[in-house]
């Protein structure tokens, strides 16, 4: 009879909750990855150099966000995410303040799934 069997082997941790992350959780996470200090700096630079009004600045913000989203996830997932964003209004919208004709993006308005985010709270 074999007596070399030892019950002291470490057990592997079993993960029982294997549900996929919800799309809203993924989008929230992606938004936090995309919108960084560098992203806001680029938007503010565009606002100053091109003297954008609020509508133009918001459009510039969203175009840059979508380009970064597309680059990050690829075209197939991008289509799914933008359909979801459009349907549920989860696109991050910028908050601008006006400095005597020059706009500055100071943060992101809250959406259904994300809190208000100020540029000071963002990852560098």
UniProtKB/Swiss-Prot annotation:
Q: Where in the cell is it found?
A: Host mitochondrion
Per UniProt, the short sequence motif DLNP occupies residue numbers: 121-124
Respond yes or no to whether keyword rRNA processing is given for this record: no
Q: How does it assemble?
A: Monomer (instable). Homomultimer. Heteromultimer with NS1. Interacts with host RIGI (via N-terminus); this interaction prevents host signaling pathway involved in interferon production. Interacts with host MAP1B/microtubule-associated protein 1B.
Could you say which protein family the record assigns here? Belongs to the pneumovirus non-structural protein 2 family.
Domain statement = The DNLP motif has IFN suppressive functions like binding to host MAP1B.
Q: What does this protein do?
A: Plays a major role in antagonizing the type I IFN-mediated antiviral response. Acts cooperatively with NS1 to repress activation and nuclear translocation of host IFN-regulatory factor IRF3. Interacts with the host cytoplasmic sensor of viral nucleic acids RIGI and prevents the interaction with its downstream partner MAVS. Together with NS2, participates in the proteasomal degradation of host STAT2, IRF3, IRF7, TBK1 and RIGI through a NS-degradasome involving CUL2 and Elongin-C. The degradasome requires an intact mitochondrial MAVS. Induces host SOCS1 expression.
What is the designated name of this protein? Answer: Non-structural protein 2
Q: Which gene encodes it?
A: 1B
